[in-house]
Amino acid sequence: WDNKSNNYLEVHTNKMSMLEELGVLAALCMLNEHACNKTLQVFVDNNGAVFAYAKGYSRKCRLLNTIISAIKIVSHSLGINVVVTDIMRRSDEGSRVTDDLSKANKSTLSGFMGTSNRVLLIPQTIWDWMKHPTMDDYSLGHRIIAEINSCGGTRAVAPYTPKFIG
């Protein structure tokens, strides 16, 4: 994001928490076929992200609220119970690989992935939102579900609408 622009000034208060939750949303979308009617536990090394997700909102970052809302809508629509759990930074192989990837170091990835993996794609809707993030965009989850359904990639049900959205 453009650091010169004041449009994202609010993001900087909880930017890392928002990015961690964006990773949760991406994982949820990529694993939708495998996680339907199951629990998806995602480990993050950011306490703020864990607490904000547990509360269901953030008082500091409205972009984080958008992502949390999208996770709730997508997970309920797909019948997936998402659990966001805290993990100490670089405390196991998975967290070390993830930390390396966040620094564009791919050297540890191949040993972790093995040979039987396939590429999973993040929905274009998320990429589009990342290019032009909007605060309080409570339709993001619905747009993601519409894209997943249009690809025929899952057994999605009608989009879930939380009571507070109306």
Report residues per predicted region.
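C-terminal functional segments of enzyme domains
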Residues: L78-E147
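Intrinsically disordered, low-complexity segments enriched in small/polar residues
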Residues: N6, F51, K55, S110, ...
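RNase H-like DDE catalytic core and adjacent DNA/metal-binding regions
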Residues: M135-G166
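Detector for Asparagine
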Residues: N3-N7, N14, N32, N37, ...
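A short, polar/acidic, helix/strand-boundary loop motif
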Residues: W1-L22, G48-S58
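RNase H catalytic domain
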Residues: V24, L28-T98
